[in-house]
Amino acid sequence: MGTKVKIGIIGGSGLDDSQIIENRTERVVNTHFGIPSDVLIEGKIAGVECVLLARHGRNHSIMPTNVNYRANIWALKTLGCTHVLVSTATGSLRDEIHPGDIVIPDNFIDRTTKRVQTFYDGNELLVGVCHIPMEPAFCSRTRDVLIETARELGIAGVHNSGTVVTIEGPRFSSKAESNLFRQWGAHLVNMTLVPEVVLAKEAGLCYAAIAMATDYDCWRETGEDVNVADVLATFKKNVTKVTELIINAIPKIAALDWTETIEELAKTVNTSIMLPHSN
């Protein structure tokens, strides 16, 4: 008998519809790191235990900088999640990634400036300093399931890899920044993937993201610079693809034995912690 799977789902802009979960119950969770963005909704998708959390709150009232990423991830861990699937709206930095396309990212570049990126900050709950390695940045096996599920569903415009630049926000990039990110080899830009992906790894959770390209940011010379109205319209038009992918991937994830993967992840975390020593 393998490890029992329980999947946390962090919904970004447009994907905070709790109706995708059956037999839903709301849980208020307070963590050592504060209160999560919203109540957590527990239930089942395709018979698999899941927990849904709206990253920005159900009323989208929390800007990216102010999201309590630590509380969100720790709350999912507290409720017994083994995996975290997230959706995120992104700007495309590549001609071949069109608005409405989906990317399953495999790497990131951090351009945030105001966010705590570790649980090991000197608190009494977790002792030491954690130098977590971020290669691979995302759970490879979980990504593989998402990619295979998208292929089986015949979802158009799916890209199997990509590097996401996470900026502080809430402002969008300048044209100079957007072109710099392109020179760095990045494919997408967003505001929420970091520190979420880092904290999930520290917590020993199998984390993968579904990134929806909603615009071309502002690097192109053809005048279609990013704006809120276009972002929301594109995400709303295409969010059913993200929902369909998540709903169909969940039972495939649950059908696999994750014991070794989770044990290896726990080992990585444990061997990354430097404990204080006495002189």
UniProtKB/Swiss-Prot annotation:
Database matches in CDD domains:
MTAP_SsMTAPII_like_MTIP
Q: Which Pfam families match?
A: PNP_UDP_1
Q: Where does phosphate bind?
A: S13, R55, H56, T88, A89, T192
Q: Name one GO molecular function term.
A: S-methyl-5-thioadenosine phosphorylase activity
Site residues, Important for substrate specificity: S173, V228
Where would you find this protein in the cell?
Cytoplasm; Nucleus
Q: Which InterPro entries match?
A: MTAP (IPR010044), Nucleoside_phosphorylase_d (IPR000845), Nucleoside_phosphorylase_sf (IPR035994), Purine_phosphorylase-2_CS (IPR018099)
User: Transmembrane ranges?
Assistant: none
Q: What is its EC number?
A: 2.4.2.28
Q: Give GO cellular component annotations, separated by semicolons.
A: cytosol; nucleus
Q: Which family does it belong to?
A: Belongs to the PNP/MTAP phosphorylase family. MTAP subfamily.
Question: What is its quaternary makeup?
Answer: Homotrimer.
Q: What does this protein do?
A: Catalyzes the reversible phosphorylation of S-methyl-5'-thioadenosine (MTA) to adenine and 5-methylthioribose-1-phosphate. Involved in the breakdown of MTA, a major by-product of polyamine biosynthesis. Responsible for the first step in the methionine salvage pathway after MTA has been generated from S-adenosylmethionine. Has broad substrate specificity with 6-aminopurine nucleosides as preferred substrates.
Q: Which named protein is this? A: S-methyl-5'-thioadenosine phosphorylase
